[in-house]
A protein has these predicted regions:
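Active-site cavity-forming subdomains of large catalytic enzyme subunits
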Residues: 57-223
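Flexible, glycine-rich loop/tail regions that form catalytic "lids" or insertion modules at the edges
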Residues: 225-227
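Long, structured ligand/cofactor-binding scaffold of large enzymes
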Residues: 1-107
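Catalytic phosphate/nucleotide-handling subdomain of diverse soluble enzymes
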Residues: 248-255
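Re-entrant/interfacial helical elements at transmembrane boundaries that shape
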Residues: 19, 239-246
Length: 255
C-alpha cells in the first residue's frame, strides 16, 4: 500500500503571505508522487496578521485546534504543513505535535524587498516609520502611496526579521523542515524546489514512522532559543516556542 500524505492548504485571497501557496501545494504533490506515495490536500483556516489584530493569539490557538482535529480525522501516514504568516507556523506545529502524526513544515517564504526614496524597505517594520513621518508632515499623500506599493512588492511573509521569519528559522532549527527551507524567497525557483523536496521527505518519514514527538527534547528547544538570540529574532518567538514545547510535555522557561 502507498502511504497517504496529507497537504494542508491555508490559501486565502485575503492573505498575501500565502499568495504563492497553491503553487507550493502542487509542487509538494509532485514530490510526493515522485517518491511513490499518494498526496491529498485539504484546507484549514488561514490567518493574516493584518486582519486578525488584536485577537491573533486567540486565533493561533483556534488554528492549532483546527490543524490537530483535521489531521486526526483523516487517514494520513504523514502530513505537509504549508503556511507562513506570523501565527500560522506555530499554530500548525502545535496542532501537528498534539495530533502525533509525522509531519514536515513548509513555509511560503519571505516577500521581496522594496525601495523607497533610495532606501530598502520591507513590511512591517518600515511601514510604522513611514507612517510616523507622514503624521509629522514629512511625507506627502503621494509619498505614502508610493511607499505602500513598495512595502509589499510581492507575495510572501514580511521581508524583515519579524515573527514569520523568526518562526521559520526556529522550525528549521528544530529539524521540522527541509534543511535550508526557511529563507528562500516566496517568488523564487528555490522555494518551489523546497516544496518538492518537502513532498519527498514526507514520504520518507511516513515509511519510517518518524514522529517528532519521539525525538524533540528540551535541548532541541534550547538550541532554537540560542538561534533566536543569534539572529536577533522576534520576541514572539519565545512565546511560540514555549507553546510548542508544551505540546510535547516540555516546560520551557527562561531559566
Amino acid at each position: 500500500d502507498k502511504p497517504v500524505i496529507g497537504i494542508i492548504n491555508t490559501y486565502s485571497d485575503f492573505n498575501s503571505c500565502h499568495g504563492n501557496l497553491n503553487g507550493l501545494v502542487e509542487a509538494s504533490k509532485a514530490g510526493v508522487l515522485a517518491a511513490g506515495a499518494l498526496p491529498l490536500s485539504f484546507p484549514t483556516i488561514s490567518l493574516h496578521e493584518s486582519f486578525s489584530f488584536p485577537t491573533s493569539m486567540y486565533l493561533r490557538n483556534l488554528m492549532a485546534m483546527d490543524t490537530e482535529e483535521m489531521m486526526k480525522a483523516l487517514p494520513l501516514d504523514a502530513c505537509i504543513l504549508i503556511g507562513g504568516c506570523d501565527k500560522t507556523v506555530p499554530a500548525q506545529i502545535m496542532g501537528a505535535l498534539s495530533a502525533n502524526i509525522p509531519f514536515v513544515q513548509l513555509v511560503t517564504g519571505p516577500m521581496s524587498v522594496g525601495s523607497f526614496k533610495g532606501d530598502r524597505v520591507g513590511a512591517c517594520t518600515d511601514c510604522r516609520r513611514i507612517w510616523a513621518d507622514y503624521r509629522s508632515d514629512n511625507l506627502t499623500d503621494e509619498d505614502v502611496l508610493e511607499a505602500s506599493n513598495q512595502l509589499v512588492p510581492t507575495v510572501g511573509t514580511c521581508g524583515v526579521m519579524g515573527t514569520a521569519s523568526t518562526m521559520a528559522l526556529m522550525v528549521e532549527t528544530l529539524g521540522l523542515m527541509v534543511p535550508g527551507g526557511a529563507c528562500a524567497p516566496a517568488v523564487s525557483a528555490q522555494r518551489v524546489r523546497i516544496a518538492e523536496e518537502s513532498g519527498t521527505l514526507a514520504v520518507k518519514i511516513a515509511n519510517l514512522n518518524n514522529n517528532p514527538r519521539d525525538w524533540l527534547t528540551e535541548r532541541s528547544f534550547e538550541n532554537a532559543l540560542r538561534v533566536l538570540l543569534a539572529v536577533g529574532g522576534s520576541t514572539n518567538g519565545i512565546i511560540h516556542l514555549t507553546a510548542m514545547a508544551g505540546r510535547v510535555g516540555i516546560n520551557l522557561s527562561l531559566d
